Amino acid sequence: MPNTNGMEAQGYDDKKNNFKPSIRVYLPKASQQPARAVIICPGGGYGHLAMAHEGYDWAPFFNEQGIAAIVLKYRMPNGNREVPMSDAYEAIRYAKEHASEWNINPDCIGIMGFSAGAHLASTVATHASEELRPAFQILFYPVISMESKYGHGGSCRQFLGERATEELKKEFSNEYQVDSLTPRAFIALSDDDRGVVPMNSIRYYSALKEKEIPAAMYIYPSGGHGWGMKDSFKFRNEMLMELKAWLMTF
């Protein structure tokens, strides 16, 4: 595939989600200055992955902005949170190791996610060591909380297991984990989202502002959950313009 590096996982089983983690790298046109990059984590409730409209379909947009798009096919946790977390960390590590080859800036690698993939992205943004913290985070209709009041039950069970303690749920409710190392954020969602309630985003945005972390949040009047790059999302053009404008602020 043109402008693509990396390998595609073989033997993907959609029912068992039995595959090796992989990345597909889309590089922008060559320039004298090293490019920024973004690791993209598709959603799917930690039970499957929406690789197209929450993954590969975003590569042209980022390449047009001069940003490398690195789409991550991460493994499902099945109750073991370390599995997808380690895949995300390894993607960042691998991108840094290949920064010279890909002409990207190793200090300007961000992370992006959708729904449960946004929980993974925000977990990396709040839990990673300083060495692996992303430079920015982009979250679409994110699962943020693992607590029963606001959290997405299916994602919580898949990520933490059936018998997760309240203490463990709080540890991975990322509105509680924002600190001075947490990167700037772009958050977008729909007001009528019934899949992942808007309070996830609102609480995370509030936590970022309490720590004086730069953040922008856009709540569209309608659209529900899971629109990604779909043409059917009524506010798609506005969303892309706002994301483009945000990316130009740093």
What are these regions (language model features)?
Residues M1-Q32:
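N-terminal cap/lid segment of alpha/beta-hydrolase-fold proteins
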Residues E90-S155, K169-K170:
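Primarily recognizes the serine-hydrolase "nucleophile elbow" in alpha/beta-hydrolase
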Residues R194-R203:
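Conserved alpha/beta-hydrolase "acid-adjacent" motif
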